[in-house]
Amino acid sequence: MAAAVTIPGPRIGALQSSGLTLLLSLAAHCSGPQAKVLSPGGLDASGANLWASANCSLLQGFWCQPASQLPRDQLSALIQRLALLQVPLQAWQLSCLANLASRCGLQDDFTLHPPNLLLFYNLSQVREADCRAFIRRAAQGDVELLSHLPDQRVALWRAAVACLVGAGLRLSASDQQLLGALVCDMDASSIGAADPHMLENLRRCPRLTAAQRIALNSLLAGGKTSLGPPGSWTLEGLQALGPLATYISPHLWAQVQEAVGLGFFRSVVASCQVGRLGQREARCFVTSFLESKTKPVSSRPRLSTGNITAATLRDDLFLVHYDCAELESCLDGCILRTNLDTLLQHLLPTECQHVVKAKLAQIYPQGLPEDQLRLITSLVYLYSRTEIGQWSITSQDTVMALLASDVALENQTEAVLQKFLEHNGTVSGALLLAIGGTRLCWMSPHQIQTIHPQELRLAGALDLSSCPQSRKDVLYTKAHETFGSSGTLAAYYRLMRPYLGGSPGGAQPPSPVPPGGAPVEELRHLAHANISMDIDTFTSLNPLELQSLDVGNVTALLGHNVGDLQKARSHPTVRAWLRSLNSSTLGQLGLDASPTSPTGPAHGTRGPPSTTHQVLHLVHTSGLPTNDAQASTSGSLWAPLGYLPLAMALPCSLLCLLHWGTCILVSVDSVASGWLGSQGSGAGKTEVLDSAGRPLGLTGQL
């Protein structure tokens, strides 16, 4: 019988099975205050059918520690339910779930698992006969989830290409399409030389680098895609491009038929207004499109022959007809006052936003009234602390509206909240949920201290990854005060997890790193609590505190997630900890001191191609390290943990854990006869070609 833990919320009776323990834990620890707590009375917890009625909102609260107690059939049912409902789990949930699935031997059922989960799987366990099916499904996932696992992202690319190329060196057009979202890591030269049908995959990319955008425009300009040459593009064809159309250059827009371009402009404005297209992408398009219209290539007459009226502002093509200079000279203050919301629905360029701000200052010299403040979300970033000091903010709704923008408001957040607090406002859990963890990062220490503990508890798990170190210190102290009496260490960890970090996730920590986040004493306590910390949380810990943890502490802290150290060894936090260890200790882990070392402790005679001359590269996205933080070039993903010195140093219970986790810690060289070993010796030079015989590259060294 699983032991019940004390959790916030309604009192729960004795738990009858580990499956029910998990279900109730999920309900109690969902990220939002609306999480549902289910009664055990109406559920049959004896089998896998327990998960048949679990809904999406409940499953979003998935937590690995109680899931590790599930029998194999219930864990399998849970994973399949997650896939069926397309539950959007976060990286920290997926990484530990992948390790649980691997430990229970469930990876062979990958066709029934969520594509995002496959990104985290141990690739050496995928059978050669299944590799194409595995890559096809994994390529449907979001590779940005691997931002904290740079080496796993590298390994996934190498595995995919090794599988698709096989014994040959040519990557066919169909193979390129099979890469799915993985093509988001292709370098510019590869995109420019890729099969035109590659556009279908590039649509999956959340963003493209500047070089990739240039290559995309080169591909489109060639006229060999399904759209044809720019002069023959249609509205339907542009809409089929999806977000890729927002990267089209002004030079290409100037070649598009005017009626088609204007029709697409209208559709972008409409999509943005209803939330189908993000503000950032839409503004990128508008800027490019309007730039093309400043050149004398269009025969359209200028329509700005008189003052701007309310009817003019309702036209989706308003920005095409009026530039920012004409906006300043033709917009009357009275029209602006009564039609401010309509005007700001347009994706105004920065210059035009400054024009509107200046006109509002003329209309309201003593500061904007509160009813108007709720309309200027897109302009808030332009206001100084002094200007915000003139505002009167009495409503929580006004605060939510002002801080709802997706732009950085480092200087505005504190000022807006201060005006609200001056009118006896309070920072509630609902407000924290509405403005998100990013805004919490920019509150002053005093404002953070005014948050009532219960409100912080109601806010749930906020994303604090972008917080500066000084705020993380304050937030950790506040959260520790709030959750310090949560009962067991496991319950405490669930609530404290977002606040344990000491440096922004995925970024190179400053040197020296200011003290903050969870101190080493707390990390040691957590290591003995069987929490199995996920690798995302681990990489966000203060690197200076980690230096005081030995191999035993870290192994116990990560539990069944210890294998993820290899997947994240190039992450700055992990790399710094590895460098603090001596060579003999590293040998116990099967790792060398430097992730960029050309040699490693576990080489086989066969394996993936040598990366010294490898033409496959990875794009350095925001989540990937650069320069000295590149991934391992040793040709070995991992070495087994079954070393005698480590066995002698660890307790029996931990050895059992590592024994079950050994399948995660297998060198790629050990499967040389499989799909990762089909490339021959790594001693030579190998080039993978596309369908036309050109080298296929990926930016960054593998």
Swiss-Prot record:
A family per Pfam: Mesothelin
Superkingdom of origin: Eukaryota
Entry-linked PANTHER family: MESOTHELIN-LIKE PROTEIN, STEREOCILIN RELATED
Name of the protein: Mesothelin-like protein
Compartment list: Membrane
Family the UniProt entry places it in: Belongs to the mesothelin family.
GO term, biological process aspect, one: cell-matrix adhesion
Membrane topology category: Single-pass type I membrane protein
GO cellular component term of the entry, any: membrane
Extracellular topological segments: 36-638
Keywords tagged on the record: Cell adhesion, Glycoprotein, Membrane, Signal, Transmembrane, Transmembrane helix
Signal sequence region: 1-35
Sections of the chain in a coiled coil: none
Keyword Transmembrane (UniProt): yes
Carbohydrate attachment residues: 122, 307, 424
Chain segments annotated as transmembrane: 639-668
InterPro entries linked: Mesothelin, Stereocilin-rel
Protein purpose: May play a role in cellular adhesion.
Positions of region (Disordered): 588-611
Residue intervals on the Cytoplasmic side: 669-702
Claim: Cell cycle is one of the keywords in the record: no
